[in-house]
């Protein structure tokens, strides 16, 4: 989210990329490895704490007739539980705690990143790729543990003519191992692009403000665009958490039911 007017060398009042700079807050070097506690680390901790507070405050009463806060928490639970059942099957509910945690982390990280001076951790490919590779390795390991070598049937779609089978298998293998890339880039690129657009239009507003009366009239359009884009970004933040999670459910379905 736009965090102020950082002057760039080219004269544009706002640097759209400044908001993504990872800065060490507590420098730490272990055996030549930079393990500093950064602003990204801080906002990941804030995200986890916010989720913990949200769940604790929402469910502390445990009333049979839920209040507003408890209803919100239960709606998250129901929504994600239905997502798992519909896309991965009822037997996938054993993995519900992981999928629920994954959705909540991405959702809260995206939403927190929309506020001024916050850091959007999901706008960094290293974070989204770490999440995607955990999903990929977990799904693959689950497939082999449950099915052994039969899990390899995931690369052999049913009903494919023998003449096309080698080509189709090759395509399926490439597609499978590219999952972490597409899974992570989708989230990273959407969050990055949206925040850059917000910062660019904020720069236009600041530029027009320095032009006197004419500039104040000219800033109406970019100011309107900021409001519209902010609303759109909140929608995208929620949607990307949903997309990342539903893809995880679909990948899990492949592990539980290979060859289907």
Swiss-Prot record:
Localization terms from the record: Cell inner membrane
GO molecular function: proton-transporting ATP synthase activity, rotational mechanism
Keyword field: ATP synthesis, Cell inner membrane, Cell membrane, CF(0), Hydrogen ion transport, Ion transport, Membrane, Transmembrane, Transmembrane helix, Transport
Membrane spanning residue stretches: 37-57, 95-115, 125-145, 154-174, 191-211, 233-253
Gene Ontology CC: one annotated term: plasma membrane
Pfam family, one: ATP-synt_A
PROSITE patterns, alphabetized: ATPASE_A
Record-linked PANTHER family: ATP SYNTHASE SUBUNIT A (PTHR11410:SF0)
Protein name: ATP synthase subunit a
